[in-house]
């Protein structure tokens, strides 16, 4: 597994990655897989499309695609949160087709390795929805500790190198 740059060759694949469950929608037209469309709303993370646009206009954020065996399987966004005054793993997602296989844990460890190369970065924060039980378990397993604080209605976690 590795982190790769988002490029003009792969950006469309990145925005089509989703954590949303596969849903077939019927209407006046033929049924289609809603998961085959880029999503703007995810359960516990902002969409990849939103995140990529955010990183264009706020260049403190670094965006990477997560690749495993030549397949794009996820997305990460990290950098310095100027408003809060700390380094943050702002977004991490693994596509629904690849969840439950340990890829999220591996991907977070890769991001932490990347962030460790930043001289000033001695700790990394992330925040998550209080109902994201699976995510919280993964974060704690890696070594993030709950701060018992909220950030924008999300629980704050900290990882210290």
Q: Model features per residue range: what roles?
A:
Residues 140-149:
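Conserved acetyl-CoA-binding loop of GNAT-fold acetyltransferases
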Residues 115-127:
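Conserved GNAT acetyl-CoA-binding A-motif
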Residues 126-136, 152-155:
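Conserved beta-strand-loop-alpha-helix junction that forms the acyl-donor binding cleft
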Residues 156-161:
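Terminal substrate-recognition subdomain of acyl/acetyltransferases
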Residues 1-90, 95-97, 114, 148-152:
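Acetyl-CoA-dependent GNAT
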Residues 94, 100-113, 137-141:
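Conserved acetyl-CoA-binding loop-helix of GNAT-fold acetyltransferases
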Residues 3, 100, 128:
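Conserved SAM-binding loop
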């Amino acid at each position: 597994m590795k982190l790769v740059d988002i490029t003009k060759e792969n950006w469309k694949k990145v925005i089509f990655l989703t954590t949303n469950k596969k849903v077939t929608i019927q209407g006046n037209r033929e049924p289609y897989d809603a998961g085959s469309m880029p999503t703007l709303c995810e359960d516990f993370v902002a969409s990849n499309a939103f995140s990529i646009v955010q990183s264009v206009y706020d260049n403190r954020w670094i965006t990477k695609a997560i690749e495993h065996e030549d397949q794009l399987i996820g997305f990460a966004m990290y950098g310095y949160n100027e408003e809060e005054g700390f380094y943050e793993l702002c977004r991490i997602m693994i596509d629904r087709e690849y969840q439950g296989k340990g890829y999220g844990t591996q991907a977070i460890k890769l991001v932490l390795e990347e962030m460790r190369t930043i001289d000033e970065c001695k700790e990394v924060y992330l925040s998550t929805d209080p109902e994201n039980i699976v995510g919280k378990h993964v974060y704690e397993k890696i070594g993030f500790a709950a701060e018992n604080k909220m950030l924008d209605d999300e629980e704050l976690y900290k990882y210290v190198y």
